Amino acid sequence: MPGQNYRTISEFILSGFSAFPQQLLPVLFLLYLLMFLFTLLGNLLIMATVWIERRLHTPMYLFLCALSISEILFTVAITPRMLADLLFTHRSITFVACAIQMFFSFMFGFTHSFLLMVMGYDHYVTICHPLHYNMLMSPRGCAHLVAWTWAGGSVMGMMVTMMVFHLTFCGSNVIHHFLCHVLSLLKLACGSKTSSVIMGVMLVCVTALIGCLFLIILSFVFIVAAILRIPSAEGRHKTFSTCVSHLTVVVMHYSFASLIYLKPKGLHSMYSDALMATTYTVFTPFLSPIIFSLRNKELKNAINKNFCRRFCPLSS
């Protein structure tokens, strides 16, 4: 309203876990801590295996390493703060720290989506154009693709963060979430620009994510068409099995994201919001290295060769 005085907010209060029973918080802390450590260990194990095993020095595993790095950084940007809030009652976060957390969560989230899209393209070239693979997926070209995914994630993250934090925040400084979640933060904004910024943020996010999903689906349409032309059932199964881990992670990534951003308005409470948000911020990065290492026979054998047999001789 014209002439209304807005107080300057220098910090926010994260109240995402305030609705949980106090006796449940230590259990959640231990669970999320173990998942956080396993996420770091699993992704570092994948990266170390690819680094050591020379036959894994291919575009597919370069993209997988880039994905592991983005998952590690995404997890580090969110989970330590969440673990601290589970232990301590003082859950404030400064205005600047909130903006930084939002930027990194969006940056690595967008980068993750872009990398999944590039990995889909890699599978498409491998199966549909095997004779031209070395030309289309040259080391220099793959390095450029990885660089563009990170640059794109950085630009998109900066764009969304600047749009949100150029708004005026008034009234309550309590964010009903365990992190600086964009939708929860926008509810605290006021002024004439708020509605247009909300539309802008949604447009940027939906355009980027749906665009990536569309290109992934398009890649798999061509992949399935090529697989169906393989005469033997064994050949079809072997070819499709190379894509299963990537397809599983894509489905998981977009399914959990939909739980957060596309859930019906009627299903809304701090308790349910926090639980659903952890599926994307904690559970997805936790499952990704498991899926890639278990569903990828070549990677699983390399891990067993370089680590399991070396450090666990009894298991061999």
From Swiss-Prot:
Disulfide bridges in this chain:
C98-C190
Question: Which residues face the membrane's Extracellular side?
Answer: 1-25, 76-99, 161-197, 260-272
Its main subcellular localisation, reduced to a broad class, is membrane
Cited InterPro entries: GPCR_Rhodpsn (IPR000276), GPCR_Rhodpsn_7TM (IPR017452), Olfact_rcpt (IPR000725)
Query: Where does the record place it?
Result: Cell membrane
| An example Gene Ontology biological process | detection of chemical stimulus involved in sensory perception of smell
Does the keyword Glycoprotein belong to this entry? Answer: no
Please name the GO terms that the record assigns under molecular function.
G protein-coupled receptor activity; olfactory receptor activity
Q: How does it sit in the membrane?
A: Multi-pass membrane protein
Q: Which residues lie on this side of the membrane: Cytoplasmic?
A: 47-54, 121-139, 219-238, 294-316
Sorted keywords for this record are:
Cell membrane, Disulfide bond, G-protein coupled receptor, Membrane, Olfaction, Receptor, Sensory transduction, Transducer, Transmembrane, Transmembrane helix
Q: Which Pfam families match?
A: 7tm_4 (PF13853)
Give TM regions. Answer: 26-46, 55-75, 100-120, 140-160, 198-218, 239-259, 273-293
Q: Name a single GO cellular component.
A: plasma membrane
Please report which protein family the annotation says this sequence is part of: Belongs to the G-protein coupled receptor 1 family.
Any idea what job this protein has? Answer: Odorant receptor.
Official protein name in the record? Olfactory receptor 10H3
- What lineage is this protein's organism placed in? Eukaryota, Metazoa, Chordata, Craniata, Vertebrata
